[in-house]
Amino acid sequence: MKKGKIKALLVLLVIVLAGIYYYVTIPAINIHSTGIWIFILFVLVLILAAYAAKKKFTSIREVKSSKFLKIGGIVLMAVLLVFAAGSILSSPIVNAKQYRNLLTIEERDFSEDIQPVNFSQIPLLDKDSAMILGNRKMGSMVDMVSQFEVSDLYSQINYQEKPVRVTPLVYASPIKWLTNQSQGIPAYIMIDMTTQDTSLVKLDKPIRYSEAEYLNRNIYRHLRFHYPTYIFDQLSFEIDDNGTPYWVCPVRKYTIGLFGGATIGRVVLCNAQTGECQDYTLKDCPEWVDRANPADLLIQQYNYYGTLVHGYINSIFGQKGCLKSTDGYNYMAMEDDVWVYTGVTSVSGDQSNVGFVLINQR
């Protein structure tokens, strides 16, 4: 085979493999995304491997004498060094004060600030209990149970001033996806957290964009192709005041170095039925959205606040004055929003609560 054809085939192979890697991993094209750095390293290794295959080196001496491989190796090491330096300089080790200030905390008096809650607004079920009810409801739907299952999402939201959990159906298997994906997902589950009433809400238009899809209608891939530079946090399945299903997609903003100080700067709302996307700042987000800030991120930010009170070294060794959230958290419906609440304890692990924290997910 002619050298020109071999070169063209190798170039095509590199492009195809890089394209497949990008399509599968869908990293954000953003300097703050660790995924894009890994993608760059992958492409560099592919290029060097293709060049070595074209040249058909027969000895280590030939490899060492190749100017192209030397330059490629230097570029590869430079990318690795920048990535490593960025990771260290973005960490709490050198930015303890900035990490502690990620979340604004107000100390309040419980008896003065917290009013008695209407019992009709107190969730009586946790997520595990809701999952049991959801699976039981799905099992009774003889026309769907062989083709669909219930997703494990179970997002807690406020719907018409009631705390409910909502979760979409998913295809029962890849084969069931293949036979049903043209029609989409026909319903979602809604559970009233105060009365335990469980309903399967059938939709006039099916859900076509979800985590259960495998190709372009996969919600993560759909978002990436619409917003190639956005770094998305944990997605949440919610419904608006009319019961229309949406994906609430928080967009991360990094405020400390390359990879540190993650907060939420924007929210993308994706209609799960049509795939239509709308981009909002946090303050302009529609009122029905309850989970603009993921609970795990808020808890992490509180733990930075509690443990870094006297710097990073103290948080590891002396631990003077260090507090952290207790294991697990739950949700409370208050002021027509969903609040994350968790206990606060010392890092010594004495299992005693010294208070609790309420964080608005808006």
Regions found by a protein language model. Give the residues of each.
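Soluble extracytoplasmic regions of secretory-pathway and membrane proteins
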Residues: K3-R362
